[in-house]
Amino acid sequence: MIKITFPDGSVREYNEGVNGLQIAESISSRLAQDVLACGVNGEIYDLGRPINEDASVVLYKWEDEQGKHAFWHTSAHLLAEALQELYPGIQFGIGPAIENGFYYDVDPGEAVIKEADLPAIEAKMAELVAKKEAVVRRDIAKGDALKMFGDRGETYKCELISELEDGHITTYTQGDFTDLCRGPHLMTTAPIKAIKLTSVAGAYWRGHEDRKMLTRIYGITFPKKKMLDEYLALMEEAKKRDHRKIGKEMQLFMFSDTVGKGLPMWLPKGTALRLRLQDFLRRIQTRYDYQEVITPPIGNKLLYVTSGHYAKYGKDAFQPIHTPEEGEEYFLKPMNCPHHCEIYKNFPRSYKDLPLRIAEFGTVCRYEQSGELHGLTRVRSFTQDDAHIFCRPDQVKGEFLRVMDIISIVFRSMDFDNFEAQISLRDKVNREKYIGSDENWEKAEQAIIEACEEKGLKAKIEYGEAAFYGPKLDFMVKDAIGRRWQLGTIQVDYNLPERFELEYMGSDNQKHRPVMIHRAPFGSMERFVAVLIEHTAGKFPLWLTPEQVVILPISEKFNEYAEKVKTYLKMKEIRAIVDDRNEKIGRKIRDNEMKRIPYMLIVGEKEAENGEVSVRRQGEGDKGTMKFEEFGEILNEEVQNMINKW
């Protein structure tokens, strides 16, 4: 018999070789119907894969990321199976599950697969699903794998196999299709009830631009047709909210191939928005006793070797900068934390000095393949609202509570009222991969759990999801159309203090290692602005929007009066502009609605004579006429009421 430990700490005994489905069946028939995959000691298993030793087990359903992953991974194989029937001789690259669905990279030879072909491929996939084919996992020797795929002319698969170690190779078969794959997968294709292939694109083999361009087919599947219908409706709304489209319409940021791919440039209005966000966070951080620093955009290679970032980002980094005289290597900064560790080391530290809170809006650079770049959410240069807290082990909980306060203020002030968290803890069984003492880990993990409970924060606990250097708390927000975005992280780190030999003198006159806490409420300025645009559809909170008021004279002779109104509003610290183009008033209104400016003030002969403005509110239409001084007072009060909330 073997012992199976569940997430709630309960333990049951089963026969050796029991699988995830059998465990689910022993709990309830409903769970057995819903379960899609299982976690075994932190590794994701197919439901039919045997468990031969004591283990921690988590059962994953559609609602879980791991459940969706198995569902979409099998769907990728289903796509490949359909392509194999429709395009004889087609070769396959890779076909992973991704955040929303899956894709498969294929080489169709002389054939060309276009978007117009997708409905026929979908129909073939549905035909195969109707057969309810079993998905069978097999271990295979490296030589046998090379022969099997070589006999089929699968050059891409043979290249992958040649790089694998013997004894660690598995295949999955459904119907007449067999693929090289680690899994996990569903036990059959039967649960796949709704299929949509979404697009066709080009992708270089293995992401290298000097390799062959393959055809990448994207898709998504669901266990119910209703879910697909809801998803497609969501995608239509998401297109309207695309931050790249709105950012262009509002003139917030731009990209230039001449400057370089993935390198955003902030235009005046976008810069004003970003600086206002930074000033907002600065004020909060000052209240919470942070000290701001500035560090250089590059660092010596030795710094990143010490921190471990060279090993992690070295192959993905930009080319090193060589100093001609000293012969040293420098790299563009991939993270701010190594520099902050050096700042900590600059002075002897006592337990009385802690916690030390260092903050920086630091720009970092990481090389992303061109095919992975996406607007502001995936770029090669971005600015993190980074801070690192150096504290004693007994201060961890208090610091978590303070950071949670900051993140809550940030989210609520941006109208992200719906958010939750995930606590990532150690694997309960395999603890040898984690750095730091058991005592410190247990204290930190308990501190995070208690902090969430004290704040009444809904938090899901995930065992085995912690980084090797410490537990963390990730915040997920739901935007206006129900999408979940990961924004804001608090991460305990026992690794960097060890690597940099950070110390403080304790009350016992002995040297101790501090605990390091990483935190970034925004995550990065670029990603946060992108999410904020899509959440608000560009209609930012009034206090934040780059331009709060646009004044629209109905003809050129009222431009002078419009300028007078603007001057007064600016004296009231209201961001106002005049649209004095020689256009009809209807055209001006439409154009400025596109720019999402909250208030439009229309001025003509009557308004100029009476010192008034006709007020229009974005999305609400005509709000009547009033003295421009009265409007200024009302708007100023509206903004101050928003700011005073935080």
UniProtKB/Swiss-Prot annotation:
Organism superkingdom: Bacteria
Domain TGS: 1-61
Cofactor(s) this protein cannot do without: Zn(2+)
Binding, Zn(2+): C337, H388, H518
One GO molecular-function entry: metal ion binding
One protein family per Pfam: TGS
Cofactor binding annotation: Binds 1 zinc ion per subunit.
E.C. numbers: 6.1.1.3
Keywords, in A-Z order: Aminoacyl-tRNA synthetase, ATP-binding, Cytoplasm, Ligase, Metal-binding, Nucleotide-binding, Protein biosynthesis, RNA-binding, tRNA-binding, Zinc
GO biological process terms on file: threonyl-tRNA aminoacylation
Reaction equation(s) it catalyzes: tRNA(Thr) + L-threonine + ATP = L-threonyl-tRNA(Thr) + AMP + diphosphate + H(+)
Cross-referenced CDD domains: TGS_ThrRS (cd01667), ThrRS_anticodon (cd00860), ThrRS_core (cd00771)
Residues covered by region (Catalytic): 242-541
Claim: Cell membrane is one of the keywords in the record: no
GO cellular component: cytoplasm
S-S bridge residues: none
Localisation per UniProt entry: Cytoplasm
Enzyme class, broadest EC rank: ligase
Similarity remark: Belongs to the class-II aminoacyl-tRNA synthetase family.
NCBIfam families registered for this protein in UniProt: thrS
Record text on subunit structure and interactions: Homodimer.
Role noted for this protein: Catalyzes the attachment of threonine to tRNA(Thr) in a two-step reaction: L-threonine is first activated by ATP to form Thr-AMP and then transferred to the acceptor end of tRNA(Thr). Also edits incorrectly charged L-seryl-tRNA(Thr).
The protein's name in its UniProt record: Threonine--tRNA ligase
Gene: thrS
